[in-house]
Amino acid sequence: MSLGLVGRKVGMTRVFTDDGDSIPVTVLEVGGNRVTQIKTDETDGYTAVQVTFGTRRASRVTKPLAGHLAKAGVEAGEIIVEFRIDATKAAELKLGDTIDVDLFSVDQKIDVQGTTIGKGYAGTIKRYHFSSGRASHGNSRSHNVPGSIGMAQDPGRVFPGKRMTGHMGDVTRTVQNLVIVRIDAERKLLLVKGAVPGAKSGFVVVSPAVKAKPQVAAAA
């Protein structure tokens, strides 16, 4: 895994190209990541860097976490995220370093992870796009029910994983291969083409795309 940034989803807007085309973008505030811990193979069994984002009052920080941050000399943040990196990259970092938006570049493809908006308890039609039953013609009380969920006498049970009603949303999702349209270094903002999981002010983790296809140069 490559080094990335953790931040917050600001919202959506649009930007215009020089040709006048409108591009929908999501604004991400991702600057000011502080290094709180550097893990190595010798001490932890793997190599990674731990960063924090945002600010938190000292009264809202647990004593174990306060000691952990004091050791790094870092101000308490709202969230802590870990990125797996190689030993060469880890050697370039030290406790207290700040990682900003200059980690990325315009037109770079990234993966963005966030927590989807919770929808509460939902039925199978909303949750899994099941078809509803007939409105009439013999159907009186089965308009929005999922239908049969079982099998015959053998196996005589409902298989695990059967799509049924339940809590919808509020799960971690990753959108891959989003393109960075603009970078506002002064305000530490990334403008990413397309939608990103989660509500406004929700935390997001931004990292270089793992499935990005190499750009092929156009033939002369």
From Swiss-Prot:
Keyword Ribonucleoprotein set for record: yes
GO CC list: cytosolic large ribosomal subunit
Example GO BP: translation
Keywords associated with the record: Methylation, Ribonucleoprotein, Ribosomal protein, RNA-binding, rRNA-binding
Gene3D superfamilies assigned: 3.30.160.810, Translation factors
Molecular function terms from GO: rRNA binding; structural constituent of ribosome
Pfam family, one: Ribosomal_L3
Residue stretches spanning the membrane: none
Residue numbers carrying N5-methylglutamine: 153
Domain of life: Bacteria
Biased composition (Polar residues): 133-145
Coiled coil (residue ranges): none
Post-translational modification: Methylated by PrmB.
InterPro entries per record: Ribosomal_uL3 (IPR000597), Ribosomal_uL3_bac/org-type (IPR019927), Ribosomal_uL3_CS (IPR019926), Transl_B-barrel_sf (IPR009000)
Region (Disordered) residue spans: 132-153
Similarity comment: Belongs to the universal ribosomal protein uL3 family.
PANTHER family found in the cross-reference section: 50S RIBOSOMAL PROTEIN L3, LARGE RIBOSOMAL SUBUNIT PROTEIN UL3C
Record HAMAP family: Ribosomal_uL3_B
Alphabetical list of NCBIfam families matching this protein: L3_bact
Entry function: One of the primary rRNA binding proteins, it binds directly near the 3'-end of the 23S rRNA, where it nucleates assembly of the 50S subunit.
Subunit structure: Part of the 50S ribosomal subunit. Forms a cluster with proteins L14 and L19.
Descriptive protein name: Large ribosomal subunit protein uL3
Organism expressing this protein natively: Ralstonia nicotianae (strain ATCC BAA-1114 / GMI1000) (Ralstonia solanacearum)
